[in-house]
């Protein structure tokens, strides 16, 4: 391990490692300084100055715009990304054109090395937690579920609208030790599901009714004639 590396943050009371990153400081590059909860230091590995601190985040949320029915599932989805100043570098924009995904505190050290120091991508990255709320057409505000982003920053949640009308959806990322909170809003309309009419038998036409009456009458006449014929034959005997 070279002198001045890695850069480690320890708990002052317990000595436990909070985080570490493979940056190297040198005497001629100056000592790290801290102000406004941000550490600034020179990294001799790439001759850049790094600022280490809690960064801003950006949350998005989308809902279906059409075809939403009461009682049918929909998917609410979005992203949570890191929008720190460093993510706007040419290298980062080229590698992450859709934004740098936000990750959990536990994944932060290896993730930052991957983003900024050309280290291999971590194999076990965990995302951040997002909670979704809705304001329905009755002005009832309620939580509808909690989900977690993946390594691309994407999240989704299945939910079933229970009343008709307009819904406003709020996706809230509460923040972590590494990121400030952020939230996003969208809306959709749920309509009552269409009731499919039950098939009914079409009523008989007047012609059909007269036809069957005539048939019945003819049958009755034939039966009567047959009975009379039998009686006459017996009388002759």
Regions found by a protein language model. Give the residues of each.
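Extracellular and select intracellular beta-sandwich modules with Ser/Thr-enriched
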Residues: 142-145, 180-185
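Enriched for extracellular/lumenal, surface-exposed ectodomains of secreted and cell-surface proteins
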Residues: 163-182
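Secretory targeting signatures
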Residues: 51, 76-78, 171, 177, ...
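A generic structural motif
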Residues: 24, 148, 162, 186-188
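Glycine-centered loop-to-beta-strand initiation motif
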Residues: 139, 143-159, 165
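Intrinsic-disorder/low-complexity, polar/charged segments enriched in Ser/Thr/Lys/Arg/Asp/Glu/Gln
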Residues: 73-75, 154-156, 183-185
């Amino acid at each position: 391990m070279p002198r001045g590396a890695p850069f480690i943050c320890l708990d002052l009371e317990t000595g436990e490692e909070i985080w570490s990153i493979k940056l190297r400081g040198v005497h001629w590059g100056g000592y790290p300084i801290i102000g406004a909860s941000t550490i600034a230091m020179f990294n001799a590995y790439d001759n850049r100055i790094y600022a280490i601190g809690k960064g801003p985040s950006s949350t998005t949320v989308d809902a279906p715009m059409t075809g939403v029915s009461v009682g049918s599932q929909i998917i609410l989805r979005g992203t949570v990304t890191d929008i720190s100043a460093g993510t706007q570098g040419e290298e980062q924009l080229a590698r992450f054109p859709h934004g740098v995904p936000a990750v959990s505190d536990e994944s932060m050290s290896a993730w930052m090395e991957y983003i900024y120091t050309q280290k291999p991508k971590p194999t076990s990255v965990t995302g951040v937690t997002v909670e979704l709320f809705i304001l329905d057409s009755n002005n009832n505000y309620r939580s509808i579920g909690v989900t977690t982003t993946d390594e691309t920053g994407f999240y989704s949640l299945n939910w079933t609208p229970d009343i008709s009308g307009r819904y406003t959806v709020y996706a809230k990322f509460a923040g972590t030790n590494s990121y400030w909170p952020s939230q996003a809003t969208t809306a959709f309309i749920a309509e009552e599901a269409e009731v499919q009419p039950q098939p009914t038998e079409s009523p008989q036409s007047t012609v059909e009714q007269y036809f069957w009456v005539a048939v019945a009458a003819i049958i009755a006449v034939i039966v009567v004639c047959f009975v009379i014929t039998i009686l006459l034959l017996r009388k002759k005997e």
